[in-house]
């Protein structure tokens, strides 16, 4: 149960290594419920932040490769922007090529940073589709300046300790972002 002053230091949901960025949202009770679901181990898909020196580390999981990449993107964006009231106003299509799945994860996250830096937009959702010679990524974006900033904005994707693999419970990834 959240108490009156818990919005200042909200309780840490079970299953999360660090408090979810969404806990700083305007409605702490709803944010807490969404955060627990996003980071609850055993759910079919989700994401969470984990402690990592001065950088941002995101873990994500889903039944499919594309779902795992989607969760990694949402985890990244939610680490620095409150998406609770966000809705898509633009669609951006990018064709990306990668030799391996972890290269694709890096390429998608680099595109997220590029969109933010060049046009000031951030994804609120995305869809991936395999095509001849690559992957089409459709980003549903919104103007980042209309959202509340809740953390440091990532500047680059680090290749250090990058993990992306399929196991018997689906796909998992862990990626570090320089902030």
Swiss-Prot record:
Induction, as annotated: A member of the dormancy regulon. Induced in response to reduced oxygen tension (hypoxia) and low levels of nitric oxide (NO).
Family named by the database record: Belongs to the archease family.
Record-given protein name: Probable protein archease
InterPro entries for this protein: Archease_dom, Archease_dom_sf
Single Gene Ontology MF annotation: metal ion binding
Function comment: Activates the tRNA-splicing ligase complex by facilitating the enzymatic turnover of catalytic subunit RtcB. Acts by promoting the guanylylation of RtcB, a key intermediate step in tRNA ligation. Can also alter the NTP specificity of RtcB such that ATP, dGTP or ITP is used efficiently.
Binding-site residues for Ca(2+), renumbered to this chain: 55, 178-179
Membrane-spanning residues: none
Gene Ontology BP annotations: tRNA processing
Superkingdom of the organism of origin: Bacteria
Keywords carried by this UniProt record: Calcium, Metal-binding, tRNA processing
């Amino acid at each position: 149960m959240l108490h009156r002053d818990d919005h200042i230091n909200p309780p840490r949901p079970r299953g999360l290594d660090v408090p979810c960025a969404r806990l700083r949202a305007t409605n702490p009770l709803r944010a807490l419920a969404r955060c627990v679901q996003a980071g609850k181990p055993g759910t079919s898909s989700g994401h969470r932040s984990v402690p990592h020196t001065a950088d941002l580390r995101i873990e994500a999981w889903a039944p499919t490769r594309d779902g795992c990449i989607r969760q990694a993107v949402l985890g990244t964006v939610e680490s620095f922007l409150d998406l609770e009231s966000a809705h898509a106003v633009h669609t951006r299509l990018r064709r990306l090529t990668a030799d391996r799945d972890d290269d694709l994860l890096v390429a998608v996250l680099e595109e997220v940073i590029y969109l933010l830096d060049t046009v000031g937009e951030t994804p609120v959702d995305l869809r991936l589709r395999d095509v001849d010679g690559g992957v089409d990524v459709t980003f549903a974006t919104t103007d980042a300046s209309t959202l509340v900033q809740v953390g440091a904005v990532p500047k680059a994707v680090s290749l250090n300790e990058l993990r992306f693999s399929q196991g018997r419970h689906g796909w998992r990834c862990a990626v570090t972002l320089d902030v």
